[in-house]
Amino acid sequence: MGKSLSQWDDSIFSNFVVRYGFDLSEKVESYSIGMKTLFLLGLCICSQADLLILDEPTQHLDPTVRLEVMSLLKEYVDGERSAIVSSHEIFELEEYATHLAIIKEGRIIYTDSIDEAKEKHRIIEKGESLQEGEVVGLVVQNVLVKTNSDVGRYPKLNEIVVAYLTGKSERRLALK
C-alpha cells in the first residue's frame, strides 16, 4: 500500500508499528477501536500529505497515547503541512491548535485564531453591566462578551465555544 503513495515514509511507519505494538499479520478489523484509530492516524501521518483532515483523531485513545498523538500532530504541522481537526475535545485542542471554527447546525458561526478569540472576548458575571461590546452567550453562571473593554477576565477556549453554541437563545437571559 505505502509504495503507491509518492511521499510515503516507510521509516515513520516502521517506527509507529514498533512503538505501538501493531501486529501486521492481523487484520486491522480485529484491532480494538482505539488501536484502529491509532493505526489509521499512523497511516495518515506516514502519507506525508500536505493537508490532513481528521475527525476525532484521539477518540478511544487512552490519555498517554492521546498526549503522544497530539504531540505527533503538532510536530507534523510545524513545517509546511496543515491539519484540519474536527473534535469535541476542546481542552485538548487549546494546547495544539492555532485557529478555530465553531460549527452549529452545519454552519460556521465563528472563526478566528485562538489567541485572537481569547483577546477579543471577556467573561463577566451574570448581571454585570456592559458599557461597550456584544453579549455572545451564557457560560454556566457567567457571560461571554465580545468587547475591547478591559472588563472581567479572559476566557478559556471551551468557554468561547460553549457561549457561541448556546448563543442567541441564551443572550436575552445573560444580562438579567
Give each language-model segment a name.
Residues 52-56:
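Catalytic Walker B motif of ABC-type/P-loop ATPase nucleotide-binding domains
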Residues 86-88:
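H-loop (His-switch) motif in ABC-type P-loop NTPases
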Residues 135-176:
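C-terminal coupling/interaction segments
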Residues 63-65:
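Helix N-cap at the start of a conserved alpha-helix in ABC-type nucleotide-binding domains
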Residues 1-39:
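ABC-family P-loop ATPase nucleotide-binding domains
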Residues 93-95:
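A short, surface-exposed alpha-helical micro-motif characterized by mixed small hydrophobic
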